[in-house]
């Protein structure tokens, strides 16, 4: 890496803009980082003016993080290659569907010794079947290492400066330290673990479970039912990682990227909110995205589809009844009210055992 580490944030939505507040402040304050941070912004017109111009003049992303000032050293750039070409650290924070195309644009245009970190919660379909982790796609296309950052980090709360934790999954301790320095703040505490794949899988799968929690809220089934969906969702997350990414540590699920992120998303995230409206309004997911998300995309339904694609290929749908039911509800093969029937006889309820009597 260069003596002064250059940073580029690829993405400027709600989460990208929130993380820019932390990254920009740290780049300005810490001597190892170049003060100027570039942020790739997909150009849009807002009231007749370019979004990049608004951000650079007012230091506010009025489209995706209204009311929050960005550090003045964060510079909005509408050209992806121009934003990224000098970066030593590339922070990817865009909807996962865009990553393959972005990587094609960046191939051969970035520093060969750069590193990446993905804040993207989702999977992509692999060619020939299965699922691809976003960090793997980035590494494969750009030939650079890619860490991941996942956690119970609702963007607006991070932007407000409310205390939270996050998890960085990084297999190289040397890179883990510089990434921790870049993201750590008084209100944003970072734990680095080496179990990167499990960290990333948690970040994607919890969005599926959050859709189930939203269906429960829409049906007004109460907190007990919602708690059951969250617990069964966690068990399916653990089982999924065990089947498809063996060797991961159970302890990873008890970091911020696991159970904490799952709880937060099932009570406060956009996947829960839109899924509740899906039940109560009778509108499609696509219609609700346009109405409720201000141009942003929902991650839960496409992730559920990609996971179902994998499970179906392996003949494992019946082993993951919650994931399967949520996917089928999202594509209107099942009604939301069918969710509970689908999980009533969950494998977790069948594996019963009798506890030995305690010795008195």
UniProtKB/Swiss-Prot annotation:
This is Glycerol-3-phosphate dehydrogenase [NAD(+)], cytoplasmic. It is found in: Cytoplasm. NAD(+) binds at residues 11-16, 98, 121, 155, 270, 299. Its main location: cytoplasm. The lineage of its organism: Eukaryota, Metazoa, Ecdysozoa, Arthropoda, Hexapoda. It comes from Drosophila kanekoi. It is an enzyme of class 1 (oxidoreductase). Pfam families: NAD_Gly3P_dh_C, NAD_Gly3P_dh_N. Its EC number is 1.1.1.8. InterPro entries: 6-PGluconate_DH-like_C_sf, 6PGD_dom2, G3P_DH_NAD-dep, G3P_DH_NAD-dep_C, G3P_DH_NAD-dep_euk, G3P_DH_NAD-dep_N, NAD(P)-bd_dom_sf. GO terms for cellular component: cytosol. Gene3D superfamilies: N-(1-d-carboxylethyl)-l-norvaline Dehydrogenase, domain 2 (1.10.1040.10), NAD(P)-binding Rossmann-like Domain (3.40.50.720).
